[in-house]
């Protein structure tokens, strides 16, 4: 498995970055709204750190050996955004038809916080998508593909991605994860799935931000 050291560092940093705000809240009970400032800075700095570590991966994984041009990567990212939004609409509609709730506790909580502290949206629109693509697509999917095959690696990566969100909509997040794996595989550039992920989150967040 290529780039084991960098991959391990990315995974460790990711867990530290995501755990840090909770650890601080548990240790300092009087942080109040400052925790959202801390979390925003934490995610943005964390994204930069993970990008730096990923850039040290000198040997491309099998998915990255024949990358498309940057123009094609951009177009694939835009197409992926449309596909993931349409796919979400279809899955949520089917969920409703089956009599299950389509409400997302995760999304509702994030939007509620963002309405009070708009700067927090930077963490969700930029920091989180960049880190998640590096962890779930580049590291997990990219490194497992030679061992389990691309389909097996995509399924494993997407299951982890869905569990990480702990939202109750397992199939929805697994679908999103699989689509981002597909974009990464099609282009050989992790930036493609990053773009689609950032735009997907932005479509949800911007109406709330602009309507504030």
Q: What annotation goes with each model-predicted range?
A:
Residues 31, 61-128, 146:
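Juxtamembrane helix-loop-helix connectors linking adjacent transmembrane helices
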Residues 32-40, 104-110, 178, 182:
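Non-cytosolic membrane-interface motifs at loop->transmembrane helix junctions
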Residues 21, 47-54, 87-91, 132, ...:
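Alpha-helical transmembrane segments of polytopic integral membrane proteins
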Residues 11-19, 40-48, 77-85, 89, ...:
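Alpha-helical transmembrane spans of integral membrane proteins, capturing the lipid-embedded, hydrophobic core
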Residues 116-212:
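Transmembrane helix-loop-helix hairpins at the membrane interface
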Residues 3-57:
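Alpha-helical transmembrane segments in multi-pass membrane proteins
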Residues 26, 30-31, 55-62, 92, ...:
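Transmembrane helix-loop junctions in multipass membrane proteins, especially transporters and channels
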Residues 51-61, 183-187:
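Structural signal for the C-terminal ends of transmembrane alpha-helices
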């Amino acid at each position: 498995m290529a780039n084991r050291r960098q991959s391990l560092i990315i995974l460790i940093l990711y867990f530290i970055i995501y755990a840090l705000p909770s650890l601080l809240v548990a240790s300092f009970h009087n942080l109040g709204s400052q925790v959202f400032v801390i979390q925003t800075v934490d995610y943005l700095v964390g994204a930069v750190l993970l990008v730096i570590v990923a850039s040290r991966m000198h040997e491309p994984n099998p998915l990255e050996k024949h990358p498309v041009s940057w123009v094609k990567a951009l177009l694939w990212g835009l197409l992926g955004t449309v596909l993931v939004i349409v796919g979400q609409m279809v899955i949520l509609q089917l969920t409703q038809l089956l009599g299950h709730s389509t409400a997302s506790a995760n999304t509702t909580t994030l939007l509620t916080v963002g309405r009070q502290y708009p700067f927090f949206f930077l963490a969700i629109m930029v920091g989180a998508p960049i880190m998640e693509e590096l962890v779930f697509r580049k590291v997990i999917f990219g490194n497992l593909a030679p061992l389990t095959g691309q389909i097996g690696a995509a399924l494993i990566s997407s299951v982890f991605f869905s569990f990480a969100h702990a939202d109750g909509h397992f199939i929805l997040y697994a679908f999103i994860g699989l689509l981002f794996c597909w974009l990464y595989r099609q282009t050989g550039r992790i930036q493609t799935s990053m773009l689609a992920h950032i735009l997907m989150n932005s479509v949800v967040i911007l109406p709330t931000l602009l309507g504030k």
